[in-house]
Amino acid sequence: MNYLTLAIGTAIILLFSWYFSIREGRYHGIARFFSFESIFILVLLNWRLWFKDPFSGFQIISWVLLIASIYPGIAGYLTLHKKGKPEDNHIERTTVIVKSGIYKYIRHPLYCSLLLLGTGVMFKDPGKLQLVCGAVNLLAIYFTARLEEKEMIKKFGPGYIQYMYETKMFIPYIF
């Protein structure tokens, strides 16, 4: 692993986390930092094997997860941007609870996307360190979602609590 690349990437992720969440008191950005960081480390560990042995079981699982990560990420972002009435065009500053599109089924499509992405990158070469990074990503995403839900309850009150009862976190009808 190239440690200079790791240091530069980590600095960028820290700045992103600070600018878009933490500085405004949205502390779910701290947990989300660990998700971004674990995915970044997984990419650094596995990039050389991205296309090696493309028909192995792990590669097939990896590509299915990577491709599956695209839809919830794009659909979630576009729906938040269009329906969330964000202040200053910033999706973390939505002014209404979005309950349409993919948000009709899951509350956290962007985090679902990160979950699928991180797991897909991990499956490129699922060694011990990669499994640890994959577990960190899973835990970080779960805690990010829980922290964000507390923030949304403060912001939107009982309406968000009702929305939580109507939808699942990451997987429609399951979890």
Q: Where in the sequence are the language-model features?
A:
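Active-site-proximal inter-transmembrane loops
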Residues: 90-110
